[in-house]
Amino acid sequence: MPKISVIGAGNVGATLAQRLIEKDFADVVMLDVVEGIPQGKALDISQSASVLGFRHAITGSNDYAETAGSEIVVITAGIARKPGMTREELLAINQKIMTDVVSNCLKYSPEATLVVVSNPVDTMTYLAWKLSGLPRKRVVGLSGVLDGGRLATFVARELGVNPSAVSPCVMGEHGGSMVVMPRFTLVNGKPLSELVSPEKADELAKRAVNGGAEIVAFLKTGSAFYAPSASVAAMVEAIFLGSGKVMNCAAVLDGEYGLRNIVLGVPVKLGKGGIKEIITLPLDGQENARLQVSAEMVKAQIASLSL
């Protein structure tokens, strides 16, 4: 049976494991360092099989050997962002975690595609790529799928349309410098830039940028996990099924958009083995300038890594 492993059984990891097993295209292994947590959550999820009708198995483990032969490994392990905590402050702790996770995952699944969710995700995706030694297209991070989902929600509410009618385009850092692209965000096929004023577009963009922090402020003791897990599940499905679907993801750039040796959110075509193609949009001067500013933010984070 094909296998997908989820590293980290916190809110994002466990909810993702649930979403993946309900899609029923592969067995799912949920791994965590805390004994009992992945086992208990996997057992709970497995007991919904007769209700939901999925046939594949979900298991929980503390042993990386259980992940052996995974086609895709999703890395959610890391501490959750707390109120007032920036993504940058997560870096030192999550770097150590990522180093251990990548080493163990590739020991048992050397052919796996890595999907990185741990924050700050652009920098963690870069770190996973460097640590793994994998080709750049076999390492991809959560970015614009989630940010775009947030944007689509607010655009849909503003215009009175179904969120599924919005095809969002959010590029750059998954963080405060992310770049919403109104010209490339489509609502029923029409550019957002033609449907709202520049001021309204900026207002919607700011709401999307602050979407994660807004949830953290409400929850007080945690961060978002429903939309993030749904976003990652969509990415995993596109990779596993080889759909060729275009999504905005954190990707290693090598000349695209004039950038090299950096991970940044850009449109990519996902398929078997990870990223099949990086889409280069015809950005105007202002759009490109904003993307370059966002890139500088990520470069500063990458420079602080201990590599």
From Swiss-Prot:
The entry marks the following residues as binding NAD(+), namely: G8, A9, G10, N11, V12, G13, D32, N94, V117, S118, N119
**Keywords (A to Z) from UniProt:** NAD, Oxidoreductase, Tricarboxylic acid cycle
Gene3D superfamilies membership: Lactate dehydrogenase/glycoside hydrolase, family 4, C-terminal (3.90.110.10), NAD(P)-binding Rossmann-like Domain (3.40.50.720)
Highest taxon, organism lineage: Bacteria
Which residues catalyse the reaction? H174 (proton acceptor)
> Entry's InterPro entries?
L-lactate/malate_DH, Lactate/malate_DH_C, Lactate/malate_DH_N, Lactate_DH/Glyco_Ohase_4_C, Malate_DH_type3, NAD(P)-bd_dom_sf
Enzyme class per UniProt: oxidoreductase
Q: What EC numbers are recorded for this enzyme?
A: 1.1.1.37
Which chemical reaction does it catalyze? (S)-malate + NAD(+) = oxaloacetate + NADH + H(+)
Where is substrate bound in this sequence?
A: R81, R87, N119, R150
**In Gene Ontology terms, what is a biological process of this protein?**
tricarboxylic acid cycle
User: Cross-referenced HAMAP family, in alphabetical order?
Assistant: Malate_dehydrog_3
Function per UniProt: Catalyzes the reversible oxidation of malate to oxaloacetate.
Q: What family does the entry list? A: Belongs to the LDH/MDH superfamily. MDH type 3 family.
Report the protein name in the record: Malate dehydrogenase
